Amino acid sequence: MRIRYFAWIKDITNKDDDIIDINHPKTIQELKKYLENLYPELKKHFLQDVLRFAVNQEYVSENLNLQPIDEIAIFPPVSGG
């Protein structure tokens, strides 16, 4: 499973993406917990519920079951200019 990061999330992770094993996590909610362990600074953003998740280019709920071939993108809030 590929996890893609955008905007300031890349600054937190210091990378554009991660490849992880499907055995854990199985839902977006579990993915958030998994990523909190890898990148503790993300926890406050998850708690504020400001990040959006897309699976295979479609926005999804936290209860979606993930598959090994899924590509998950994590987006911060959009800011205008």
Which ranges hold each PLM region?
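Ubiquitin-like/PB1-type beta-grasp interaction modules and other compact soluble beta-rich domains
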Residues: 1-79
